[in-house]
Structures are given as structure tokens and as C-alpha cells.
Amino acid sequence: MYTAIPQSGSPFPGSVQDPGLHVWRVEKLKPVPVAQENQGVFFSGDSYLVLHNGPEEVSHLHLWIGQQSSRDEQGACAVLAVHLNTLLGERPVQHREVQGNESDLFMSYFPRGLKYQEGGVESAFHKTSTGAPAAIKKLYQVKGKKNIRATERALNWDSFNTGDCFILDLGQNIFAWCGGKSNILERNKARDLALAIRDSERQGKAQVEIVTDGEEPAEMIQVLGPKPALKEGNPEEDLTADKANAQAAALYKVSDATGQMNLTKVADSSPFALELLISDDCFVLDNGLCGKIYIWKGRKANEKERQAALQVAEGFISRMQYAPNTQVEILPQGHESPIFKQFFKDWK
């Protein structure tokens, strides 16, 4: 059981503190629980809140936005998310999920996959389409010499080359594959990141295996298919990757000193100095060119800034003209993910 929370005036039941999965559909601007047998079925015209309480009070709160949901419903979902997050002591890491571009973490909650139904809460339509498989399957390329970065790639052998390292994350098994011409810094980074994913995202329960080119285990072959001849690695590409990795991210400070949420760029290339993250403020880490925006919430930031995190992220996506389905991850201080930490110098 999680720490008890006050319930006076809340639209959510006391059971929100219970471990496990909780799903609500936003109906007439209110959260309505989704029965367990219907969890994994989502109406394209609606918005949902999905809360997962894991071990050791690790919580993730997802806002799922249907492709045909109204702005009113999306707004109500965001308001309810703020309320629920506050109710839980601002403990959860928050995620914005858009239909068809859900995160692997979100997909992992639904072992039978997702099903999309046309229409909305009051719709009579029941046409169903199946979402992607639920199991976590992710491939990262680890590349660079100085600004080494892990970037998600397509899950096939075409993404591989002999000059880099790759992390194949299959949930309970995490493989760090090292090309024959990869440099020692990439190999160390791949190992460290695989271990960090195990420890912070799987509570230490996943198996990490370091794989040498040519010694791939059967599980890798089962997921990726028969291994073809791989592209040769080019050491000069590491220097190009250093520059690209540095320029692919920027850091902004969020301030409401003028009564409106304003963003001030504090760094235009990574890796960033860890000292830039100040507990009194909130920050936007822009990795939108790679499909994701992060909001970091300092534990001493004022309440208005913390509660406006999702609104700030959506406004930023619009301002930068990123794709509407750009993923958003909102991280309370102390709950940073390994992928977020890699944008900073010497963050272990």
C-alpha cells in the first residue's frame, strides 16, 4: 500500500494509492473508471488517464489523447492529471501519449495489446483496430567520441553497423551489442546505460548481457531475424555524431515572473552542466528533433510552474512546429530516467 493521501473533494477514489494499474476515461469533464476487462480498449474520440503504481512507490501517470478527441476533453484530462498528480504528492513521472505513437512503457501495461474504437464516449460505433504489440522492444544506437548519445533506431539489422554499439531492450533482457570497430568509450557507455535501464526502469530485475559482434544469442536473432553482413563503421562518423548529438538538444528555463509562462534558453548544445538544473525552477529539455520533449520539475519550484508543465510542453511543441504526436515526459526532481540523464555531464 502506498502512503495514505487525503480524499476530501477529490473526484478520484482512495484506491488511487493502491499498487497496479488504474485507468479512467474523461466523460463530461469527469474521470470515470474503466473496468479491468476493458482496460486496453481506447475510443479515438476520447482522452484517458492511466496510472501505474509500481514497487517502491514508483508511479507513472499517462495522459492518452485520442486522435479525434476534442480540445475540451484534452483540457479536462490535463486538469484532472494535475489534480491526481497533486493528490499523489507530485510523485509520478508524467507522460503525454498520442494515439498511434504510444511509448513502450505505456504499451507494456497491456499484455494483449491496444484496441482502438472509433467514436467517443457517447458513440455507438464499435469498429476496432489493434494497436502495436505490448512487449517492450527497443533498439538504441550508442555513438560518438566525446558527446556520446544513445538514440532510438528502427528494430532491425539495417540499423546496425560494425563501428558502433547498440542496446536491444526486451524488457526482462537487455543486450549491449558492441561492433568490432566500436570505440572503448561507446562500449563503456552502452554497458553503463544498459545497467541504468535495468536498475531504474526494471527495479534491478532485468538481465543485462554484453554481446560481442558474431556471438549473438538466440533471443536477439529471434527478434531481429537472421543476421546479414553488417555495414562497416566509419570512425569519422563519430566526430560528426558528436556535433549532431550536441546540437540535437537545448535547455530552457521556465519562469512565470511576469504572470505568464516564459522560456529562457540557458544552453543550446549538450552535454549540459548539471548545475544548470536549479531546484527552484522548472526546465524544458528540447529533444524534439528526435521526437521527445522533457520537462524537469525542481522540487522547490513554485506550484504554478509545476502544475503548468504539460501546458508548457504542448505550447513548446506548437511553437517549434514539431509533430503533434511528439512524446512528452515530465520528470520530478529525483525521478530522472537514464535517457534524460545522458544529456548532462557526469550524471551517474
From Swiss-Prot:
Residues that span the membrane, as ranges: none
A GO BP annotation: barbed-end actin filament capping
Subcellular location: Nucleus; Cytoplasm; Melanosome; Cell projection, Lamellipodium
Record's keyword annotation contains Repeat: yes
InterPro entries, sorted: ADF-H/Gelsolin-like_dom_sf, Gelsolin-like_dom, Villin/Gelsolin
Post-translational modification summary for this protein: The N-terminus is blocked.
SMART domains on file: GEL
Modification type N-acetylmethionine: residues: 1
Gene Ontology molecular function terms on file: actin filament binding; cadherin binding; phosphatidylinositol-4,5-bisphosphate binding; protein domain specific binding; protein-containing complex binding
Key words of the record: Acetylation, Actin capping, Actin-binding, Cell projection, Cytoplasm, Nucleus, Phosphoprotein, Repeat
UniProt motif Nuclear localization signal: location: 137-146
Modified residues (Phosphoserine): 337
Ranges occupied by Gelsolin-like repeats: 27-75, 148-188, 261-307
Tissue expression as described in the entry: Macrophages and macrophage-like cells.
Function (record text): Calcium-sensitive protein which reversibly blocks the barbed ends of actin filaments but does not sever preformed actin filaments. May play an important role in macrophage function. May play a role in regulating cytoplasmic and/or nuclear structures through potential interactions with actin. May bind DNA.
Annotated family: Belongs to the villin/gelsolin family.
Xref: PANTHER family: MACROPHAGE-CAPPING PROTEIN (PTHR11977:SF127), VILLIN (PTHR11977)
Subunit-structure text: Interacts with NUP62. Interacts with NUTF2 and RAN; involved in CAPG nuclear import.
Designated name of the protein: Macrophage-capping protein
Lineage: Eukaryota, Metazoa, Chordata, Craniata, Vertebrata
Gene name for this UniProt entry: CAPG
